Amino acid sequence: ISKLSERFEVDIPQFFANPTIRNIAANLKEDANIMLRKFEQTFAFKQLKEINETEKREYQKKYAKVKDVLLLGATGFLGIYLLHQLLLESVATITLLIRADSMRQAQNRIKKHYEYYFGNGSYDQYSHRIKIIIGDLTLDMFGLTENEYKELANHIEAIINSAALVKHMGKNSEFELINVKIVENIVDFAKNGINKDIHHMSTIGIVYGANMEKSKTIFTEYDESTLDGLENQYLRSKVKAEKVLKNAKNQGVQSSIYRMSGILFDSKTGKYQINVNESSAYI
């Protein structure tokens, strides 16, 4: 797909809907200006950087008091960097819920990912502040026993969710399970035990949909997302997840949504994500 995109406009959903050479060839549109537009888009997005420092400081002051954080999706590219920053910039205990057959396997998995990005020995420096729980986010009560679930719900003060299927292609059932069902389970968890805010990582792609080439506008978590014009399975599932959070917010569950753009590599170290071949961000 990457090679084809250098010369042609590629409709990715159509590409995978009927992945035959005849169908792919019939749907390719050659465009001599495609690279020019890509460069124009890159420079346009580079200029869209505006931060409200006062609001940011107040936000950081509020959450500096949080002592127990549940971080989900910590083995992902974004998740591992969130873990790193939480360890560097807070004194909180970070609980990770990881799917594994044993505690040793779970520990080795998170250590492998952490040290891949931050160097040998970096994990051991902070391991005393990392609490690992074996579970499955797609299952009711995260696959925990009732007592384990209640205990977790009674001491976690904030939930950061970066767990997601980001392949942009695959079965609808997979996207629904990982990108929507997990968020429903997180909301159920937030309703149990002490009050806890949800911080959900979404994608900037849902803002544009079929209107991506139109003028940019301000779009926040207070605005209603829509499925109109979104044929991409990944984007549709992320819109549905945001709707779950919006409905929960109307019921008193506090949540914030952070819409990420393409995260490609660490600009300081040059490290790319481990599963670079599975992410369409590199197409």
Regions found by a protein language model. Name each.
Residues I1-K56:
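Phosphopantetheine-dependent thiolation modules in NRPS/PKS and related acyl-activating systems
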Residues I1-L4, T20, N27, A74, ...:
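Structural preference for long, well-ordered alpha-helical segments in enzyme cores
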Residues L4, I24, L72, I94, ...:
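Conserved structural-core and active-site-/substrate-pathway-adjacent residues in large, well-folded domains
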Residues I34-A158, S162:
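N-terminal Rossmann/SDR dinucleotide-binding element
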Residues V91, N232-K240:
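The catalytic Tyr-X3-Lys active-site helix of short-chain dehydrogenase/reductase
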Residues N154, A158-S162, M169-L177, K181-Q233, ...:
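Conserved Rossmann-fold NAD(P)-dependent oxidoreductase catalytic core, especially the SDR/UDP-sugar
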Residues E242-G270:
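Conserved beta-loop-beta element that borders a ligand/cofactor-binding pocket
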Residues K271-I283:
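C-terminal beta-strand-loop-alpha-helix "lid" module of Rossmann-like NAD(P)-dependent dehydrogenases
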